């Protein structure tokens, strides 16, 4: 955004919290839930964050402290005749990042299965329950590739995340950077220019000029179970990661049930 990299989850830049400098409502201008004001049951620590303002603004925010509270918050919303209730739980994502998709992950999925069952029990007749996810998870572990030093010397900055990096080349380095990225990483990743991605409609048919300006010039997307990191700023060490366009990451469940 401008000449700074925004961490949208924390709503921070290199200068710190950026809520005042980067207005969440301007950054993400589409009204959530088609402008309808509904209850949003989500972790209490996310209340009033920049990211929450961007995607859940104008909701009745019902912050929960523990997963055991979620069902009761939803029940309270339904008792108030809410036509639609949104609820978010981040346990599977956290466990996947920390432990990968092994026994810990399976245990968390079992917990979520129980939670969904409890939610279904308190639904009034004539209510639909829809369960989905925002992404999958890939076990990367120690399969980390540090970006080549010669590449880093030809860029202004990197944005994105470890499985979907955007390179912002310094002036005059676009062609050589594109060629070398393809040569070095084409065996385990997709390399695409911004123009290719926009022409192929990766982000939909209509992209605002403001959104286009946030993109880098060249994208590097992991195809294999690897992560690409800047060794000067590697970020947290994670076992499970997501962000690329493999089937494991983009195909998510959609489970629906109607309470008669």
Where are these regions (language model features)?
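Feature captures the catalytic ectodomains and active-site-proximal regions of enzymes
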Residues: 1-260
């Amino acid at each position: 955004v401008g000449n700074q990299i925004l961490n949208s989850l924390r709503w921070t830049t290199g200068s710190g919290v950026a809520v005042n400098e980067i207005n969440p409502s301007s950054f993400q201008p589409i009204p959530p839930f088609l402008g309808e004001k509904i209850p949003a049951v989500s972790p209490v620590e996310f209340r009033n964050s920049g990211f929450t303002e961007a995607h859940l603004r104008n909701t009745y925010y019902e912050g929960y402290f523990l997963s055991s509270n979620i069902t009761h918050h939803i029940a309270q919303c339904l008792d108030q005749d809410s036509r639609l209730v949104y609820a978010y739980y981040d346990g599977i994502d956290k466990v996947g990042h920390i432990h990968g998709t092994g026994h810990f992950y399976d245990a968390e999925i079992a917990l979520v299965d129980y939670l969904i069952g409890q939610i279904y029990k308190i639904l009034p007749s004539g209510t639909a329950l829809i369960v989905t996810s925002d992404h999958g998870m890939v076990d990367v572990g120690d399969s980390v590739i540090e970006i080549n030093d010669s590449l880093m010397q030809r860029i202004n900055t990197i944005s994105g995340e470890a499985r979907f990096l955007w390179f912002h080349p310094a002036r005059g380095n676009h062609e050589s950077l594109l060629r070398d990225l393809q040569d070095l990483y084409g065996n385990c990743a997709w390399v695409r220019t911004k123009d290719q991605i926009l022409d192929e409609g990766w982000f939909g048919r209509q992209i605002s000029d403001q959104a286009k300006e946030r993109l880098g010039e060249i994208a590097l997307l992991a195809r294999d179970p690897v992560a690409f990191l800047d060794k000067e700023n590697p970020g947290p060490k994670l076992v499970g990661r997501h962000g690329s366009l493999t089937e494991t990451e983009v195909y998510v469940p959609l489970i629906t049930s109607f309470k008669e």
